[in-house]
């Protein structure tokens, strides 16, 4: 083998080992996100711990960043950590506005509304909650459908709009 051939083999081995590391870290991140999603409703503190253990530099694709963003916002809310920072949910909003399932869109807009609500922007929160409601009409979304209607009713009640509040409260 010539010197050029040896160098070429060396470079090829380096590229293969680096791509293997990237692939493994991507697989590990996907596994962590799935684990966090599985325990979100039963053990939200564990979900938050899992998400906080993820190295965000390993979120190399838009879909991974969006999923992490949504799950992290959910975990904060489920642990009664009232985030007002739109930067946390923005990657999910940007991604799921045009892609994703109705379930992902529903959750994204619900949690966008929650962050807006926490920040005191009730008008934007209502718009986001109503948008979330538009994606909640599949049979497997009954819990979220009730949660969305309840939250909309609460926001209208806070604004002393009791008529609208009652109309959404009746949907629960």
Region locations from a protein language model:
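Bacterial N-terminal signal peptides
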Residues: 9-19
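A "functional boundary" signal
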Residues: 21-172
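Bacterial N-terminal signal peptides that target proteins for export
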Residues: 1-9
């Amino acid at each position: 083998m010539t010197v050029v051939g040896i160098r070429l083999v060396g470079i090829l081995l380096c590229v293969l080992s680096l791509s293997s590391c990237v692939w493994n870290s991507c697989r590990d991140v996907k596994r962590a996100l799935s684990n966090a999603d599985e325990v979100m409703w039963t053990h939200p503190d564990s979900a938050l711990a899992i998400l906080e253990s993820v190295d965000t530099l390993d979120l190399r694709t838009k879909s991974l960043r969006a999923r992490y963003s949504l799950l992290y916002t959910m975990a904060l809310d489920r642990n009664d950590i009232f985030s007002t920072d739109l930067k946390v949910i923005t990657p999910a909003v940007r991604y799921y506005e045009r892609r994703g399932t109705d379930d992902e869109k529903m959750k994204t807009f619900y949690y966008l509304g929650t962050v807006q609500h926490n920040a005191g922007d009730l008008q934007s929160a209502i718009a986001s909650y109503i948008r979330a409601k538009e994606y909640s009409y599949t049979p497997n979304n009954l819990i979220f459908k009730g949660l969305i209607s309840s939250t909309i009713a609460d926001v209208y009640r806070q604004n002393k709009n009791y008529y609208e509040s009652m109309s959404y409260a009746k949907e629960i």
